[in-house]
Swiss-Prot record:
Keyword Chaperone (UniProt): no
Protein name: Leucine--tRNA ligase
Gene Ontology molecular function terms on file: aminoacyl-tRNA deacylase activity; ATP binding; leucine-tRNA ligase activity
Cellular component GO terms, alphabetical: cytosol
Source organism: Granulibacter bethesdensis (strain ATCC BAA-1260 / CGDNIH1)
InterPro entries: aa-tRNA-synth_I_CS, aa-tRNA-synth_Ia, Leu-tRNA-ligase, Leu_tRNA-synth_edit, M/V/L/I-tRNA-synth_anticd-bd, Methionyl/Leucyl_tRNA_Synth, Rossmann-like_a/b/a_fold, tRNAsynth_Ia_anticodon-bd
Record key words, sorted: Aminoacyl-tRNA synthetase, ATP-binding, Cytoplasm, Ligase, Nucleotide-binding, Protein biosynthesis
PROSITE patterns: AA_TRNA_LIGASE_I (PS00178)
EC number per UniProt: 6.1.1.4
């Protein structure tokens, strides 16, 4: 038998007693008509509120399986909390500005706005097919002036609070496209679109002063106990607090007004091991020298082609240029060379470092390359000072200082403190706290973004746009037929009158980094139609977000910017909280096998066919190479279209498989077999409910007595309710799925004893409660099952979460193993409360155990409560 990897023909399916397509449409309409998911901006006093939010999507045009997983997880939480009696805010919006829309305009001749809104319509339809319990009336897109106008107002409030600054900074400049490139858009030193060599260029940029909050952002991580530890660690490292020293090295020969080079270091204890000073290519000393040294100027230009990110600089080969300058050591009479190095960043510390090759690998590699001295000054505890040398690896461990004059014999920590004390006493430096975090440059030279609400006047300088003139909207009549920012080229949009003096002026043509749009959207959802950015009463009730869900790839920038924005909004009177997200869950990726033809072409799942263990290209019959499950990507064509999955198996089956495969924080592999299995399970549950409903209608005389079989089923029902509740509380959704599978097996077994007293009532109860506990995961099927057994006028979506009967959770008996010398001889059913002596006595009386112990001397009796008895015999 052969079948397409992603296709399941109708004749391969079991009988479809459950028409998922019509059921899903019917129940989605019912939820909408009854406003099941609508909540007010300001809930009634005393109402319990819960805010669950998944990171909103970029409207690329179609959802992918990663979206399906993300929004399924959030919907489970939202439906579960709603059933628990909470008023649940579960909104959806669109992160709608960004470069892809401009690329579409250039490549396809369609306006970015039209492209974006068409994509939103398509993706909204696909998301609605999932049956998400979204409050759709709160939907917005960040490209709508009704949203970004409030963003402009926030920016101006931040400006008044001195949280905004305009200054020059180095950027990656594409000279062909005439635009600034983000670090990730620089590929091997070239622009990702134009292929032109990238230049580092100084431009005036707007910055948000996130560094003002560095200390608070770092300290606040300790309070986020419902965030993954690895995310908190990543943010802590990004903020990067370090204790060190700023020290000044006098130049042996002054360079104009430059008489010294200031260095920041976290290791002043290693000063006696210094070998050189390295400065950034953008350092003032380098600039002064470049004006008169062509070779040095060429090296500086080469450094500027690396890009501005730490990652790009770290990955590049470490290279340097000897300036010929030398500096004096603060503690001795030695002098050391000054090099320009391509690994030193101007915007970290002071733009200069001293190199201690013996105890820093990067410095050691540099020193070996340029034949600079290497002097160890920290001696490992197991080494001898006379023989210790540095080979290919720098030593960065603990030890005792040597070769360090007055610091000899001190630990590195003690030497660090002593070095700072001496530097301060000599006037050559001081201890300081430094931060890796840099202020956030938010200027982008693009059209499709939120306009920065500033007007530039030759007389007044930068002037804020008056509040009554917001929003500053984008012009519609733009063209993309030339490089650069269309706003710069527009004939009229930027030409305005200065609001302060009335003179001719121009608008700011830069737009905001799209991370600004996503740094406060969660707050807008609390009152999306308010005349202010956030209605204070709504923020008081809904913020912070109780549960935020999204990918680990946003662990640093988006989450850190949102934490900063929340603090800035609090300090400007907009929100009453300082943290945006009380709880954070980072889900794993959805992966899929990849398929490659013999000629190297990547094939999509619909282009291959499986013959047992062999996979071939359907068109040619040739075998294909099957790759391991990896992230779905267009480049490898291993994507699966959610819409096709919904058509074939239904939304509930897709949701069920998404939840069942792995713990949600891990990656999951999408497989055809898994989707088929989920589809069949949906059909199986429906048939179980159908059978119970039929018997319940036929049976007129119900016996109030309950047989052992009925009580066994009831106990299983309530234990399942308790187990699923516990699993959902702990985000162990795959465990909840497993418990439902077990319960379905128990229901199937119960069919064999359908005639026993009380069994019909027990089965009706089982289906009733089952429909409630699967509702967060398979909401359409839950409604359909409840209808079959005529549950009542309320929808399952309106029902309260069931509580397990404590009396039915009590374990009546447990089965334990009886072993002799570790070998199983018998089993024994006992009360879970039975004492050890009685259990051992019962075990010793078992005939099989009696025979095994006959003529033997028992030297030890081991009892593990409710699990095992083991008899140890002599010899």
């Amino acid at each position: 038998m052969t079948d397409s990897i992603t296709d399941l023909q109708s004749d391969q399916r079991p009988d479809r007693s459950y028409d998922f397509a019509s059921a899903e449409r019917r129940w989605q309409l019912a939820w909408t008509e009854r406003a099941c998911f609508t909540v007010p901006d300001v809930p009634d006093p005393g109402a319990r509120t819960y805010y669950v939010l998944e990171m909103f999507p970029y409207p690329s045009g179609q959802i992918h399986m990663g979206h399906v997983r993300n929004y399924t997880l959030g919907d489970v939480v939202a439906r579960y909390k709603r059933a628990q009696g909470y008023q649940v805010l579960h909104p959806m919006g669109w992160d709608a500005f960004g470069l892809p829309a401009e690329n579409a305009a250039r490549e396809r001749g369609v306006h970015p706005g039209q492209w974006t809104w068409n994509n939103i319509a398509a993706m909204r339809g696909e998301l609605q097919r999932m049956g998400l319990s979204i409050t759709w009336e709160r939907e917005f897109a960040t490209c709508d002036p009704s949203y970004y106008g409030h963003q402009q107002a926030l920016f101006l409030d931040f400006l008044k609070k001195n949280l905004v600054e305009r200054r020059e900074s180095w950027v990656n400049w594409d000279p062909v496209d005439e635009t600034v490139l983000a670090n990730e858009q620089v590929i091997d030193g070239k622009g990702w679109r134009s292929g032109a060599p990238v230049e580092r260029k100084k431009l005036s940029q707007w910055f948000l002063r996130i560094t003002d909050y560095a200390e608070e952002l770092l300290a606040g991580l300790d309070q986020l106990d419902r965030w993954p530890e690895r995310v908190r660690v990543m943010q802590s490292r990004w903020i990067g607090r370090s204790e060190g020293a700023r020290l000044r090295f006098p130049l042996v020969e002054p360079l104009g007004d430059q008489r010294e080079i200031e260095v920041y270091t976290t290791r002043p204890d290693t000063l006696y091991g210094m070998s050189f000073v390295a400065i950034a290519a953008d350092h003032p000393v380098a600039a002064a020298l470049a004006a008169h040294h062509p070779a040095l100027a060429a090296f500086v230009a080469e450094c500027r082609s690396l890009g501005t990110s730490e990652a790009a600089i770290e990955a590049a080969e470490k290279r340097g240029f000897d300036t010929g300058l030398r500096v004096k050591h603060p503690f001795c009479d030695e002098t050391f060379p000054v090099w320009i190095a391509n690994f030193v960043l101007m915007d970290y510390g002071t733009g200069a470092v001293f190199g201690c090759p013996a105890h820093d690998q990067r410095d050691l590699d540099f020193a070996r390359k340029y034949d600079l001295s290497v002097t160890p000054v920290v001696l490992p505890s197991d080494q001898d000072a006379a023989s210790f040398t540095i080979g290919r690896k720098a030593y960065d461990g603990d030890g005792i200082l040597f070769n360090s004059g007055p610091f000899d014999g001190l630990t590195p920590d003690a030497a660090r403190r002593e070095a700072i004390t001496r530097l301060e006493a000599m006037g050559w430096g001081q201890g300081v706290t430094n931060w890796r975090l840099r202020d956030w440059g938010v200027s982008r030279q693009r059209y499709w973004g939120c306009p920065i609400p500033i007007i530039h006047c030759d007389q007044c300088g930068p002037v804020p746009v008056p509040a009554d003139q917001l929003p500053v909207t984008l012009p519609e009549d733009v063209t993309f037929d030339r490089p650069g920012n269309p706003l710069d080229h527009h004939p009229s949009w930027k030409h305005v009158t200065c609001p302060s003096c009335g003179a001719a002026a121009v608008r700011e043509t830069d737009t905001f980094d799209t991370f600004v749009d996503s740094s406060w959207y969660f707050a807008r959802f609390a009152s999306p139609h308010a005349h202010v950015p956030v209605l204070k009463e709504a923020a008081q009730n809904w913020l912070p977000v109780d549960q935020y869900i999204g990918g680990i790839e946003h662990a640093i920038l988006h989450l850190l910017y949102a934490r900063f924005f929340t603090r800035a909004m609090a300090d400007t009177g907009h929100v009453p909280v300082r943290e945006p997200f009380a709880g954070l869950f980072t889900q794993g990726m959805v992966t899929h096998e990849s398929y490659r033809a013999a000629d190297g072409r990547w094939l999509s799942p619909v282009e291959v066919t499986r013959h047992g263990e062999t996979v071939v290209e359907t068109a040619t019959g040739e075998p294909v190479q099957v790759g391991r499950g990896e992230k779905m990507s267009k480049s490898k064509r291993n994507t699966v279209a959610p819409g096709e999955i919904f058509n074939r198996y239904g939304a509930d089956a897709a949701r069920w498989f998404i939840l069942s495969d792995n713990p949600p924080e891990r990656d999951m592999e999408w497989t055809d077999a898994g989707a088929v299995g989920a589809y069949r399970f949906v059909q199986r549950l429906y048939r179980l409910a159908e059978a119970v409903a039929r018997i319940a209608k036929e049976e007129t005389n119900r016996d109030d007595a309950s047989s052992d079989a009925a009580m066994t089923l009831r106990r299983m029902t309530h234990r399942t309710v308790a187990a699923v509740t516990e699993a959902l509380e702990g985000f162990n959704f795959n465990v909840a799925v497993a418990r439902v599978y077990e319960f379905a097996n128990a229901l199937t077994e119960a069919e064999k004893k359908a005639a026993e007293p009380g069994m019909t009532a027990a089965r009706v109860e089982a289906i009733t409660l089952l429909s409630r506990i699967i509702a967060p995961m398979m909401p359409h099927l839950a409604e359909e099952m409840a209808t079959l057994i005529e549950q009542g006028p309320k929808l399952v979506a309106e029902q309260v979460w069931p509580s397990a009967d404590p009396a039915l959770l009590v374990v009546q008996s447990v089965t334990i193993a009886i072993q002799v010398m570790g070998k199983l001889r018998a089993t024994l059913d006992i009360s879970p409360d039975a004492d050890q002596d009685s259990v051992i006595a019962q075990a010793e009386a078992d005939p099989n155990v009696v025979r095994a112990l006959e003529g033997k001397r028992v030297v030890k009796r081991i009892y593990v409560p409710n699990r095992i008895v083991n008899f140890v015999i002599a010899g």
